[in-house]
Each structure stands twice: as structure tokens, then as C-alpha cells.
């Protein structure tokens, strides 16, 4: 990303780079941009090293869920593949990402109205447990999955995007609304 940033800077091109909530360990949640990143794996470490926080470049920390074109290995695709089965839903795994559809709309809004944003900004939804998220997807997509509450895994990588929302006035829909839009788009 840093080489790409240099090329963009040289050619007066705006770079919008994507980072992840995985730059944080998940030990506390509600992370702000000012919180010290503490990744716990190579993915989080590599994404942190790639963040651009200089010049006119924009790094967006976020996470998203939605359909995949090829691999079909994302959380969303896995949930859909569990139709008519029984699975565990982690009630202490807290998530604040967006659907891919909503994220695309946010990026479009940034390009159209907020191209002056630069530095590292976090974009997130209201926090939700993976258990509750699976319930919403299960209901909307009529998957007939029996979801068991599981509290054995704990991770809260929820992001606080109050700064972004205040600066841009971009409103992130509820999880019910985002999943409904994803359903209607499929």
C-alpha cells in the first residue's frame, strides 16, 4: 500500500485504502481511531503495517459481510451453507462491520461528497453479537438453522465511528435493514 500511495501522490490521485478491525485484539471493544492497535495475528499485523496516515490518502478501518463471487468461504456464505442444520452462535463475539452493499454505498458517498477526508477513519455499524447476526440472516433468508448460544469464545473488535459519522453525517442502517437490503439485492 505504501508504494501505491507514493504512485498516487506523484500522480495527484486520491488513494482510498481499506484496513480492518483486526488491527485490534478484541480485548475491550468500542475502539476509537486514537486507541493503540494491538493485533494478535499476521493478518492484523500486515493490515496495520499497510495503513496510510499521511497526505491526502484515506485509510478506512472497517469489516464487512456479504456474498462472495468465487470462494464462498466468508461468514455470510458459511451461514447460508448451513441451511437446515444446527450451529453455534457466539454471543460474546461482538462485531460492528457492514454488509458489502452498505459499504459500497458508503464508499460512493465518500467519493461523491467527502473526498477531502484523509488519514485513518473508522466506519462501523451498531455492535452486534455473531449469535444475533446469525439469527437475523437465518430469519431473512429462511435458512431454518437451529442456533445454539455459545459463550466459549470472546472477542470484541467493535469499532467506534462517531468521529466519521459526525464529520460526514453518513448514517449506517440497522442490521435488520442492511440484511434486508442484501436479501433484496440477491
Task: Name these PLM-found stretches.
Residues 104-109, 113-161:
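Mid/C-terminal beta-alpha module of Rossmann-like enzyme folds, strongest
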Residues 1-16:
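NAD(P)-cofactor binding segment of oxidoreductase domains
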Residues 15-21, 60-62:
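SDR active-site strand-loop-helix element
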Residues 21-41:
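Active-site "gating" loop of Rossmann-like NAD(P)-dependent oxidoreductase/epimerase domains
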Residues 40, 52-95, 100-102, 108-109:
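NAD(P)-dependent short-chain dehydrogenase/reductase
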Residues 143-186:
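C-terminal amphipathic/interface module of NAD(P)-dependent oxidoreductases
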Residues 1-4, 43-51:
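Conserved catalytic Lys-bearing alpha helix of Rossmann-like short-chain dehydrogenase/reductases
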Residues 89-94, 121-128, 167:
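Glycine-rich Rossmann NAD(P)(H)-binding loop
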Amino acid at each position: 500500500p505504501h508504494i501505491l500511495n507514493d504512485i498516487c501522490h506523484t500522480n495527484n490521485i486520491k488513494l482510498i485504502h481499506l484496513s480492518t478491525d483486526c488491527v485490534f485484539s478484541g480485548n475491550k471493544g468500542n475502539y476509537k481511531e486514537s486507541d493503540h492497535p494491538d493485533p494478535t495475528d499476521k493478518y492484523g499485523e500486515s493490515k496495520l503495517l499497510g495503513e496510510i496516515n499521511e497526505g491526502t490518502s484515506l485509510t478506512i478501518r472497517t469489516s464487512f459481510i456479504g456474498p462472495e463471487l468465487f470462494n464462498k468461504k466468508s461468514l455470510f456464505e458459511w451461514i447460508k451453507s448451513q441451511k437446515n442444520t444446527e450451529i453455534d452462535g457466539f454471543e460474546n463475539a461482538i462485531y460492528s462491520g457492514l454488509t458489502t452493499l452498505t459499504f459500497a454505498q458508503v464508499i460512493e458517498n465518500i467519493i461523491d461528497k467527502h473526498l477531502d477526508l484523509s488519514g485513518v477513519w473508522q466506519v462501523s455499524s451498531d455492535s452486534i453479537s455473531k449469535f444475533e447476526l446469525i439469527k437475523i440472516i437465518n430469519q431473512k433468508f429462511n435458512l431454518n438453522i437451529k442456533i445454539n448460544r455459545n459463550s466459549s469464545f470472546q472477542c470484541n473488535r467493535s469499532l467506534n465511528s462517531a468521529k466519521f459519522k459526525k464529520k460526514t453525517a453518513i448514517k449506517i442502517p440497522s442490521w435488520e435493514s442492511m440484511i434486508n437490503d442484501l436479501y433484496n439485492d440477491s
